[in-house]
């Protein structure tokens, strides 16, 4: 099998692990920077070019597209899809997951429980928005934030109004969410591949913070989850059309709440904490999908 990993940096842990896992199973792997690709878009002979040469066919593509390169990265991935390459996560699914507002709307439409979330444009609606999510304390999140960046805990109503006014002053799109106090600065990351949860970790915020992201200095440990949590994680990934996803769940009194679904979950923290070879599981999933394709 000939594989392409779409990544801006082939030295990153997740990219290295995927490359090593694929090579260990006898596959040829190229790491391709999507921003160095350019495309010929036509119905007769579409093509992808990379650093001055036309790329040959790849059986499958593993997208490791960062948030800052979503628009161009998914355009390149669409071109690979048009040329017949199997995408581990399809471009449309990645685009859905990267739009926090759209993804929450899709999850809610599927009946998946979420933290109460508000969204508004007019400053006149700020008071109602705060009340809608249960008042302070509450969380204000940039729609385009990632890895805990652009996430603020407002502990009082006045603080919430100030944060919302500041984000509006920056012309930034943001969400307002209830603060789930009983989660205690912890969340559960479920790594979903296909219709299975293959690894689970509980992430803890560092002292003095409420964000549990490992990139923000949080820690992680392997945990077990309930059947309800497992079902919610699988349902959330499927609702966005993702074959591989990191589903982040808050453990609330009323049950598991999906906080976010990550279309390009990092492997370092969850492989270390769970002691699972997730990279190889991703490669074997691709092998099975390609085998299904060829048997049709």
Curated annotation (Swiss-Prot):
One of its GO terms (cellular component) is cytoplasm. ATP binds at residues 141, 178-179, 187, 211-213. Residues 104-287 form the ATP-grasp domain. Mg(2+) 2 binds at residues 260, 262. The keyword Metal-binding applies. Mn(2+) 2 binds at residues 260, 262. GO terms for biological process: protein modification process; SOS response; translation. This is Probable alpha-L-glutamate ligase. Pfam families: RimK (PF08443), Rimk_N (PF18030). Mn(2+) 1 binds at residues 248, 260. The gene is rimK. Mg(2+) 1 binds at residues 248, 260. GO terms for molecular function: ATP binding; metal ion binding; ribosomal S6-glutamic acid ligase activity. Its EC number is 6.3.2.-. Keywords: ATP-binding, Ligase, Magnesium, Manganese, Metal-binding, Nucleotide-binding, Protein biosynthesis. SUPFAM superfamilies: Glutathione synthetase ATP-binding domain-like. HAMAP family: RimK. It is an enzyme of class 6 (ligase). Binds 2 magnesium or manganese ions per subunit. The lineage of its organism: Bacteria, Pseudomonadati, Pseudomonadota, Gammaproteobacteria, Enterobacterales. InterPro entries: ATP-grasp, ATP-grasp_RimK-type, ATP_grasp_subdomain_1, RimK, Rimk_N, Rp_bS6_RimK/Lys_biosynth_LsyX.
